[in-house]
Amino acid sequence: MAMKRLPLPRHHVPVEIILEGEHETVIAAGHKHLTSLNFQNTTSVEISVPWSEPRPSEDRNFNITVVHKREADMFFLCGTNGMKTLCCDMNLSEQTPRCLPSENMRNIKDSIREFVIKEGEPFALVDSPDSDLYITYSGSRENVGIYKFGKNRIAPGRHSKEQHYVGLVLSREKEPDKSKVYAFYREKNKDQGMYSEMWLAFVTRVCTVDRGGSKNILQFSWTSQMNARLSCGHADSRQHFSELVDVTTVHAEQWEQTRIYALFRNEWGMSAVCVYTIEDIEQIFKTSPFKDADEQTGRPRECVADSTKIQKNVLKMIQMNSEMKESVQPVDNSGPLLSNHHLYTHIHVHGSPNNRHPTVLFLSLNNGAIHKVMQDESRTFVIAEYQPFNHRAHVVSIRLDPPSRKLYVSSRTEVVQLNVANCSQYGDSCELCVLARDPYCGWDGTRCTPETDASNVVKCSSP
């Protein structure tokens, strides 16, 4: 198996991996530094983050909590010291990169200052003249939920639920006023009965134009938020999965057909993957009755241009309950795409917008191994297992560079590059190449090679 590995600095506790898109280079974000890793010439360069406001001696007190690649070498970063948060832009192409807030990020910088970002929280940046940052806060405190920072800061309403967020997805509506943010999370089940599940899986949705309610009722809090359970299981065997672990998104040309691949576990040591579309999620939010509530006449289900003008009696309805009675079912009301007795920790999916090619899933195991899984029209199966590390390890993140078919896997101590289109391993005969059923490989007439338009000739000539 073709692989390369580069160690991370000893003091580097990884936060995220970002693909640079050329020359086999990735950026590994740690607590204190960014590290540029070049797998072509196996070199690494450590980049300090000079936070602009504190004195140089205070820089080391800030931990990086948000890293987002805006364009080319321009990165948006946030860091916290446990009391306040700073955000800035860094141009990594500069000889000595500076950490300065750009004009369209200034509202984020000003509104987020007193907020403390927790490590590993999902976020989404809307990069525009009036940029907004959406970020979650997980835990059991009364202030958990989705936050919006920018020109109009919005916070979640207070509640007593324990929630842990695993993903945020921005909608791509043609009309900006209809754009939404979807968050996926698991919630501690308050029903502690003998047959009750410990966790419940949810999707929640807010509108990006939401400005909060009127004075005294949901002021500066979400008025557009609605929540729905995610269902994942085998109806015939009563085998259900409710602990949401991770999600990843495959975008479609028609936004409603965008697919969410959700990784679940259950209390019996099994994992499962269920797939949902934005269209099916939206259908529940548009049509389902609200849970434990009478008909809520006048309550908006679409985004409202000015939420501060919503009538007070409607705001009180929203404040009382935002959960739907019906659950979101997987695509075509199917069961899990995949379920087995492995403990998976992360999911990454490579799919085509129009499903022209088989979908490939990469799933990390709790021992550091990676499963490569193929999904075709009839079934889903594991076609390869990779061992990127020489020892048992916790996988921090997995990222695929689709053009090169290179998979980057990070642990707390190193980043490994795997060639997941290493087709020569299937031998030098057409039959062996085709029997491998690897969507990244095909027979070009002489050898098993990474798939191109000229390869993948399924029918083999008789000898």
Regions found by a protein language model. Give the residues of each.
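Disulfide-braced loops of extracellular cysteine-rich modules
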Residues: 424-437
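Extracellular, cysteine-rich, disulfide-stabilized repeat modules with beta-strand cores
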Residues: 434-450
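Disulfide-stabilized extracellular ectodomains of secreted/luminal proteins, especially beta-rich
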Residues: 1-405, 409-417, 425, 448, ...
